[in-house]
Regions:
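Short, hinge-like loop/turn segments at secondary-structure boundaries
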Residues: 39-45, 49
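Flavin (primarily FAD) cofactor-binding/catalytic cores of flavoenzymes
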Residues: 1-36, 50-54, 58-203, 208, ...
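Long alpha-helical segments found as membrane-embedded helices
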Residues: 212-220
């Protein structure tokens, strides 16, 4: 298994249930967050701390992970070199358990591979029956000409990550990567788009300025990679969208 995100770790755990040996290759360190903290979903715990300043919230989150998991080195995994929040954490309850029980074997970055034979950067070589790459997604819109829209290698100049500054009837729904769940945000974006289509919501006149403001002032400062161009703070983005919708048009949050 190549990758350290949610999909890679989930697939590594699942394949380890039926395979004789499963290895997972990370090219950098990731923070692994449990799905449940203190008996509650980790995103709910994060939401309950949202009234705190971001730096303090990140510090407490980092300390909580260290207390619950210990250091990555204890599991043979690379330690994260970035600050908390600069990259997306991985949410998984079983990976560290499987590593400790010898079901998943951590490996470093890959130097090269020839067929099913993989040579790692530490000089070790292993042969695998199946190699699965979960190395992320490219932001792509193949149905558009590249000179029209191509956000694969650049920042995304869209107001609320959905409105183009020139084309009023073009909407991007769900093209954001929150530090939290994407579905409630996508729902609100869809509702806002519906109101724009029916004329119940009017685009701001300074939308070009607002698009550039989102690019220059992102919610979260992260490392400069194509993956991190659409990151939003879940709670802040939720508030921004809700302000533009009638109160009776917004779904109520479930109580946990």
């Amino acid at each position: 298994m190549i990758g350290g995100g949610n999909s890679a770790c989930d697939v590594a755990v699942e394949t380890s249930r039926v395979s004789k040996k499963t290895s997972i290759s990370w090219r950098r360190g990731y923070r692994v967050i449990p799905k449940f903290i203190f008996g509650k979903p980790s995103d709910i715990v994060s939401a309950q701390m949202h009234f705190l300043p971001r730096k303090l919230r990140y510090f407490l989150s980092e300390m909580t992970i260290k207390i619950l998991n210990g250091s990555n080195k204890l599991y043979g995994l690379e330690k994260p070199k970035t600050k908390f929040g600069e990259t997306h954490p991985t949410v998984n309850d079983e990976l560290l358990y499987k590593i400790r029980h010898g079901k998943v074997h951590p490996k470093g970055d890959i130097e090269r591979y020839d067929g099913n034979t993989v040579t790692f950067k530490d000089g070790s070589t292993e042969e695998f029956d199946v190699i699965i790459s979960c190395t992320g997604y490219i932001l792509s819109h193949p149905f558009f000409e590249k000179q029209f829209i191509d956000y694969s290698e650049s920042k995304v100049p869209l107001y609320l990550k959905m409105f183009h500054e020139k084309y009023e009837h073009l909407f991007f729904i769900g093209m954001c990567q929150p530090l939290g769940c994407v579905w409630p945000l996508s729902e609100l974006q869809a509702k806002l788009a519906a109101r724009a289509i029916t004329g119940e919501w009017v685009r701001p006149k300074n939308i070009a300025e607002l698009c550039q403001k989102e690019v220059s002032r992102p919610h979260v400062k992260q490392i400069k990679t194509p993956r991190h161009t659409i990151t939003v703070d879940y709670h802040l983005f939720l508030k921004q969208l809700r302000r533009l919708l009638p109160k009776d048009y917004v779904s109520k949050e479930a109580k946990v």
